[in-house]
C-alpha cells in the first residue's frame, strides 16, 4: 500500500469515527417524544393522545429551563416531574423505565423518587389532574 492510499483510508476511518462519536450520544435524544403544551393560567395543558403508545412524553413548558417528564402509569394516572437533577442541575434522561442523570449517575423512578445517588433530593414533582382528554399540570405548586 502506498502512502497516498494509506492516508486516504486513514482519513475515511477518522471521519467515520468522528461521525459515530457525535451521532451515538445524539441518537438517544432523537427517540424522545417531545410535545408542546398550552399554558392556561398556571397550568400546562396537554392532550392524552399526545402519548400515543409511549408511556411518557417530554413537555416543553413555558418558563421552565428544562422540559417536564410526564409519565403515564399502567392504572391511567399521570406523574409530572422536572428533568433537572437535584444534585448539580443537569438534565436527566429517560432510559429503561427510569430517569438517569448523565453527569454523575443519579437515578430516579418515573415518579421522581431516588433510586441511586449522589443526588440528595427527589426530582421536583408537579400536581397532575386529568380532565376528560386533557392532562393539566399545575406549575405553581409542588405535589406531595
Task: Spell out what each predicted region is.
Residues 1-21, 25:
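N-terminal secretory signal peptides and thylakoid transit peptides that target proteins
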Amino acid at each position: 500500500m502506498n502512502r497516498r492510499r494509506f492516508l486516504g483510508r486513514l482519513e475515511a476511518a477518522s471521519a467515520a469515527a468522528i461521525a459515530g462519536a457525535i451521532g451515538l450520544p445524539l441518537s438517544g435524544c432523537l427517540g424522545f417524544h417531545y410535545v408542546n403544551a398550552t399554558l392556561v393560567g398556571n397550568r400546562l395543558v396537554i392532550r392524552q393522545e399526545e402519548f400515543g403508545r409511549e408511556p411518557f412524553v417530554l413537555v416543553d413548558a413555558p418558563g421552565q429551563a428544562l422540559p417536564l417528564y410526564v409519565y403515564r402509569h399502567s392504572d391511567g394516572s399521570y406523574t409530572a416531574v422536572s428533568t433537572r437533577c437535584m444534585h448539580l442541575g443537569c438534565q436527566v434522561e429517560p432510559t429503561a423505565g427510569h430517569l438517569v442523570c448523565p453527569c454523575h449517575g443519579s437515578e430516579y423512578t418515573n415518579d421522581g423518587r431516588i433510586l441511586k445517588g449522589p443526588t440528595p433530593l427527589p426530582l421536583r414533582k408537579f400536581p397532575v389532574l386529568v380532565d376528560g382528554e386533557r392532562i393539566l399540570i399545575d406549575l405553581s405548586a409542588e405535589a406531595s
